[in-house]
């Protein structure tokens, strides 16, 4: 049925005709997510009529039908202004049982009405900044959090739980104040950690299920997304022992999530949300990833269970096949693996054995090939600075932050970006908690080491001599041409001669010479003033 016909029926006020018109419209547009511009004014008129009835109170008998029509029209951005009013939002929140009230949450609400109201609110909060502001002012997050806390005691349908969590996700993603309110005032990390454990259906010390069912997967992903929003900056602050215990408890659940498969071909998506949240944990809490007890069939390395680290590495390999949004795909898992390797020697040695095995092929450039090392070295020169930074940082940590070892595996040309940023162009080693790991050279590498070009990281074929057959006068002429070309480029600021400062940073040649001379003068006792 057309919006104009439905609006005409509403204006007649005949209950049966109105109900039938709404039901017909709902059936026809249940899967409509885009709308015809030609009927825009008719839809706006219908929306205003619906709002007037909504604010006065919907008939209990046909409440679901009315809410379904509101839900469909709330997908249309041209109708948002009508629905995004304080009165409309309050009415929808009342039907969803999430208005702040002294009264307890009803024991047996109408779940169909509650669900439709939640869907309407999700649509409005997603698309309307006004609705976002009004929802925050109405403190809807308080009642939502209270209901999430009741999931263990009361039985709510899957869809109600899912849209509770979806609305929480939208509010925390779009409103900083709601994010802080849930994190601090409502103790959101503890609340949602308990909800995650309930959804996964396991205790931290038990083995994870083989497959997480589809509905539990959907709810778990929403919980992970809300937790990500509210813990986004928690890693930047120190945590006390009580908070550290909570984050470690959450870490054990995330460890389960990494190891479990998700139904409906959603495993990679599920693991992606898990890894994103792992990156928000305080660094000292990541030790839970290596705390899994050894059992038959587990992957042991240096007496430590590496099942979780191996699973994260396999996830990284999958993500490296992505061709778009590479930063979002690989940066979180690379950050987690980097911190695990930096803080735990067994993890670093295991990852190095997998990613940077002893060099045998010395005739292929480090970035060429399909090995994991080759793919990561290619990322070191990616256009996205964040992508190349995290890839280089990961490999640098696997090399125990040893500059010669880093250059050996990646080539000086690929390594130059990180070394310049760290002030390590002149070599050396930054301060770090690393033991002296052995880096055993293969026979092939030892034999070719003297012939390896440090810039490209491989043995180069000896190029022909371009001056072969030239007379001395011709050579001198070509040399002067080259000098003049460089001089012209330098004078026109196309290129700038660079040098190494005493601190190991690249700087202009003039500045580098000045710093060197200043350093020499300051260290020369004869240069002191009389």
Swiss-Prot record:
The subcellular localization recorded is: Cytoplasm, Cell cortex; Cytoplasm
Q: What SUPFAM superfamilies is this protein classified in?
A: ARM repeat
> Residues of the signal sequence?
none
Q: Which Pfam families match?
A: Ric8
| Cytoplasm keyword on record | yes
Q: In terms of one coarse class, where is the protein primarily found? A: cytoplasm
User: Which BP terms from GO are recorded?
Assistant: adenylate cyclase-inhibiting G protein-coupled receptor signaling pathway; basement membrane organization; cell migration involved in gastrulation; cell-cell adhesion involved in gastrulation; G protein-coupled receptor signaling pathway; gastrulation; in utero embryonic development; regulation of G protein-coupled receptor signaling pathway
Q: Which GO terms describe its cellular component?
A: cell cortex; cytoplasm; cytosol; membrane; plasma membrane
Q: Which UniProt keywords apply?
A: Chaperone, Cytoplasm, Guanine-nucleotide releasing factor, Phosphoprotein
Task: Describe what happens without this gene.
Answer: Death during early embryonic development. Heterozygous mice exhibit impaired spatial memory and decreased anxiety.
List GO molecular-function terms, semicolon-separated. G-protein alpha-subunit binding; GTPase activator activity; guanyl-nucleotide exchange factor activity; protein folding chaperone
Q: Which residues carry this modification: Phosphothreonine?
A: 440, 442
Tissue and organ distribution: Expressed in neurons and neurites of the CA1 and CA2 subregions of the hippocampus (at protein level). In adult brain, it is expressed in the neocortex, hippocampus and cerebellum as well as in the pineal gland and ependymal layer.
The Phosphoserine modification is found at 435, 501, 522-523, 527
Q: What is the protein's known function?
A: Chaperone that specifically binds and folds nascent G alpha proteins prior to G protein heterotrimer formation, promoting their stability and activity: folds GNAI1, GNAO1, GNA13 and GNAQ. Does not fold G(s) G-alpha proteins GNAS nor GNAL. Also acts as a guanine nucleotide exchange factor (GEF) for G alpha proteins by stimulating exchange of bound GDP for free GTP.
Which PANTHER family has this protein been placed in? Answer: SYNEMBRYN (PTHR12425), SYNEMBRYN-A (PTHR12425:SF4)
What interactions and quaternary structure are annotated? Interacts with GDP-bound G alpha proteins GNAI1, GNAO1 and GNAQ, and with GNA13 with lower affinity. Does not interact with G-alpha proteins when they are in complex with subunits beta and gamma. Interacts (via C-terminus) with RGS14; the interaction stimulates the dissociation of the complex between RGS14 and the active GTP-bound form of GNAI1. Interacts with NCS1; interaction is favored in the absence of Ca(2+) and myristoylation of NCS1 is not required.
Family the entry assigns: Belongs to the synembryn family.
Annotated protein name in UniProt? Chaperone Ric-8A
Species assigned in the record: Mus musculus
Gene name for this UniProt entry:
Ric8a
């Amino acid at each position: 049925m057309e919006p104009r016909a439905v609006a005409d029926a509403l204006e007649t006020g005949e209950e049966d005709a109105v109900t039938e018109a709404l039901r017909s419209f709902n059936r026809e547009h249940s899967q409509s997510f885009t709308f015809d511009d030609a009927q825009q004014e008719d839809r706006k008129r219908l929306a205003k009529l619906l709002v007037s009835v909504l604010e006065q109170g919907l008939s209990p008998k046909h409440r679901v039908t009315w809410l379904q029509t509101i839900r469909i029209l709330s997908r249309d951005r041209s109708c948002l202004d009508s629905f995004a009013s304080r009165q409309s939002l309050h009415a929808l929140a009342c039907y969803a049982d999430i208005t702040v009230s002294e009264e307890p949450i009803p024991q047996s609400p109408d779940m169909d009405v509650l669900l439709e109201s939640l869907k309407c609110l999700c649509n409005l909060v997603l698309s309307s900044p006004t609705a976002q502001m009004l929802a925050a002012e109405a403190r809807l997050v308080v009642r939502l959090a209270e209901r999430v806390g009741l999931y263990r005691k009361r039985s709510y349908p899957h869809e109600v739980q899912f849209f509770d969590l979806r609305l929480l996700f939208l509010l925390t993603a779009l409103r900083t104040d709601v994010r802080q309110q849930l994190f601090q005032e409502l103790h959101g990390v503890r609340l949602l950690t308990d909800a995650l454990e309930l959804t996964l259906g396991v205790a931290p010390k038990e083995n994870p299920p083989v497959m997480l069912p589809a509905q539990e997967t959907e709810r778990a992903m929403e919980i992970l997304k809300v937790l990500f929003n509210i813990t986004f900056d928690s890693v930047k602050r120190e945590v006390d022992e009580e908070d550290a215990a909570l984050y470690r408890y959450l870490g054990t659940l995330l460890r389960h999530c990494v190891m479990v498969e998700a139904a409906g071909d959603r495993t990679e998506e599920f693991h992606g949300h898990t890894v994103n949240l792992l990156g928000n944990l305080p660094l000292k809490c990541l030790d839970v990833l290596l705390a899994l007890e050894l059992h038959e069939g587990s992957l042991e390395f240096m007496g430590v269970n590496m099942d979780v680290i191996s699973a994260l590495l396999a996830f990284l390999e999958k993500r490296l096949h992505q061709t778009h949004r590479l930063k979002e795909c690989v940066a979180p898992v690379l950050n987690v693996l980097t911190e695990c390797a930096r803080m735990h020697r067994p993890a670093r040695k295991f990852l190095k054995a997998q990613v940077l095995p002893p060099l045998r092929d010395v005739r292929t450039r480090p970035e060429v090939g399909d090995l994991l090392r080759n793919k990561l070295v290619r990322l070191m020169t990616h256009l996205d600075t964040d992508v190349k930074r995290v890839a280089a940082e990961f490999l640098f940590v696997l090399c125990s932050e040893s500059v010669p070892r880093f250059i050996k595996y990646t080539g000086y040309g690929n390594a130059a970006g990180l070394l310049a940023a760290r002030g390590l162009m002149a070599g050396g080693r930054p301060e770090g908690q690393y033991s002296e790991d052995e880096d055993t050279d293969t026979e092939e590498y030892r034999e070719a080491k003297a012939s390896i070009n440090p810039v490209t990281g491989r043995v180069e074929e000896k190029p022909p001599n371009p001056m072969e057959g030239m007379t001395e006068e011709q050579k001198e002429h070509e040399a002067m041409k080259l000098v003049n070309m460089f001089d012209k480029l330098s004078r026109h600021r196309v290129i700038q001669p660079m040098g190494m400062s005493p601190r190991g940073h690249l700087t202009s040649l003039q500045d580098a010479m000045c710093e060197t001379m200043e350093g020499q003068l300051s260290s020369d006792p004869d240069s002191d003033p009389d």
